[in-house]
Amino acid sequence: MYAIMGITGQIGGVVARTLLAAKQPVRAIVRDAIKGQAWSDRGCEVALATIEDRASLATAFREAEGVFLLVPPSFDPLPEFPEAQAIGETLRSALVEANPERVVYLSTIGAQAKQSNLLTQHTIIEKAISGLPIPVTFLRPAWFMENSSWDVAPAMQQGVIPSFLQPLDRPVPMVATADTGKVAAGLLQVAWNGRRVIELEGPHRVTPNEIAATFAKLLDRPVRMEAVPRMSWEALFKSQGMKNPIPRIRMLDGFNEGWIDFERGEVGSQKGNVALETVLKGLIARGH
């Protein structure tokens, strides 16, 4: 039995569908029964649990051959990341109690970075569960291509996409959620010992200008990127409702300055197969 967190989302859904296609039993971990109904209809066992509740998580993880851990993203965390600290301890305690055979945690590129930023939340959770007497894999995917869902409307309507990734010709490690979910499902089904890190990106690194050019091709209209001035970010993010935008700003700095990358660089990462054009085509079709 494979217990899957985040099953109602993009990556968790791919993990579950990949396992089901391989005739593997899946336990869908959901917050409420209504969200689990579709997975129950697919033949999954359903476990009700929340990320804050150790007891329900331990029950959901118990007797699992593999557990896929996915923590909901927090884009506006409190200073010092107390939410991540609490989640890390809850997951650690639940895993100790349940003692599954192996664990795959969906972490992030740059989890090893020393500078504090939005992704430090994953650094904290990695540290919390890294000492478990259970085989643990930290799957560290690159920037998700699906983040370009925010770019669809400006590309279609104005032909100009604001970019926080800059310079616009700087290649950025990116990966599709489909590749991420498939790799996670594969990792769950293979035994290993101890702690390991798998770094994952797409077929090649992508520049913001390439994103614009791909939109232009798919939409059959001129599309270009426009860098959002760094000095305007804090005021802009606060105007959008963020209370503590500094971690997000520092994350963007990390990508732009190169200190958020893979430990082993591009040469040491595993490569997915899904191309940027495939992802953008899907986003356009869904009207994102």
Each model region followed by its residue ranges:
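Short, conserved active-site loop motifs that form the nucleotide-linked donor/cofactor pocket
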Residues: G43-C44, V136
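A hydrophobic C-terminal alpha-helical subdomain
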Residues: T18, R230-H288
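Short secondary-structure boundary segments
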Residues: V71, S107, G258
